[in-house]
Structure formats: C-alpha cells, structure tokens
Amino acid sequence: MAKPLNERFFIPHEIKVMGRWSTEDVEVRDPSLKPYINLEPRLLPHTHGRHAKKHFGKANVHIVERLINKIMRSGGSHYKVAGHFMRREHRSLNSKKVKAYEVVKEAFKIIEQRTGKNPIQVLVWAIENAAPREDTTSVMFGGIRYHVAVDISPMRRLDVALRNIALGASAKCYRNKMSFAEALAEEIILAANKDPKSYAYSKKLEIERIAESSR
C-alpha cells in the first residue's frame, strides 16, 4: 500500500518567498496600490515572462520579481542621475535573472538584520512612500505647448517607485566600495522611513512639487 502524499514528499505548511519570508502578514496601506502589488505566496518569484504580452499583465507579477526585473535593466541612454549614467555601472545584471535574484535576496537579508522586520513589508512601505500621485504632461493650445498637472494611474505609480528605487541603489554604489545589495537595502530602508536621503522618496517629492506648480 502506497504511503500518503505528505509522508512521501515534504509539503511545507506555508510557502515563503525565497524560502525565508512570508507574505501573509504584509499589509498594503495605500488603497489605490493594493490591487497592483502582488503578494501571492510564491517560493520562487520568477514567471518566465508569461505575462509579458498580456495587457496589464504586470499586475499578476509578484512584487519581488518586479523589483528583480527593474534592477536588471541597463536604462536608456538619455537617463542620468547626478550627471552620470548610473545604470551602466551594473550592466553585469542585464538580462541575468539568477544573479539579480541573488542580489535582491542578499539585500533582503541586510534589511532584516538592520530593521528586524519582514523585508517584503519594508519594500511595500518604500513603494508606497516613493510612488508619486501627480505628474505633468504637455498639451498644446493654439500652437503653444503648456505643462499641466495630471493624476497618475496606480500601475504607473508602482512602476515609477520601483524604477527610482533601482536608480537610487545604483547611484549609492556608483564609484563606491558599497556593494549593489547593500545600496539596494539602504535605499529601500530610507524610502520606507521617508528619509530625504532616499533618491526614490526625494524624486517623488520633486515630481509632485513640479506638478503642483503646473496647476
């Protein structure tokens, strides 16, 4: 007679991200971002691009995987931080998901050591604090172009927050002995605490200030 399934195989009672951190108690306070921050229990945050060609498919990608995807990008040639092409310093992560996964995992360990809290919860707080609510767009009236303030959709708010967190981490370790994992951990912690030293949080304040002046 065959043994029961739970005796033949190890079946965990709770699935934890990267085998270490649970998402059950992670809380999203921002009601507009809540539907788009995916916190489904997932051992390995890797969907192999199955949502890439689906409209709004990013909403089904785990938030940790979206962070991993952001740090893999080399950035556009026109994008600068403090006058330098910061993202190019970490082109070794470009399209290398396993390496980017290990960087994020190491950053989460550092966050856990420094704060004593679940790093996924700290990441969610950082995203909420770094997501701008307003931005500017250009419209043309009578052949003259004007900048006007517009509300930002929740999906774009999340994209901008993750992009600026990744850029801030790159800026912190640019020409510095600090590792990328340490810089990423520091940027997430600073953004979660609304510290002006955080690139992502200060960038959010700048975007909203420009939008307010364009009303």
UniProtKB/Swiss-Prot annotation:
Membrane-traversing stretches: none
CDD domains assigned: uS7_Eukaryote
GO cellular component, one term: small ribosomal subunit
Record keywords, A-Z: Ribonucleoprotein, Ribosomal protein, RNA-binding, rRNA-binding
A Pfam family annotated for this UniProt entry: Ribosomal_S7
Biological processes annotated in GO: translation
GO molecular function, one term: structural constituent of ribosome
Gene3D superfamilies per the UniProt record, alphabetical: Ribosomal protein S7 domain (1.10.455.10)
UniProt xrefs under PANTHER family: RIBOSOMAL PROTEIN S7
Family per similarity comment: Belongs to the universal ribosomal protein uS7 family.
Functional description taken from the UniProt entry: One of the primary rRNA binding proteins, it binds directly to 16S rRNA where it nucleates assembly of the head domain of the 30S subunit. Is located at the subunit interface close to the decoding center.
Summary of subunit composition and partner proteins: Part of the 30S ribosomal subunit.
Name of the molecule in the record: Small ribosomal subunit protein uS7
Natural source organism: Pyrococcus furiosus (strain ATCC 43587 / DSM 3638 / JCM 8422 / Vc1)
Gene designation per UniProt: rps7
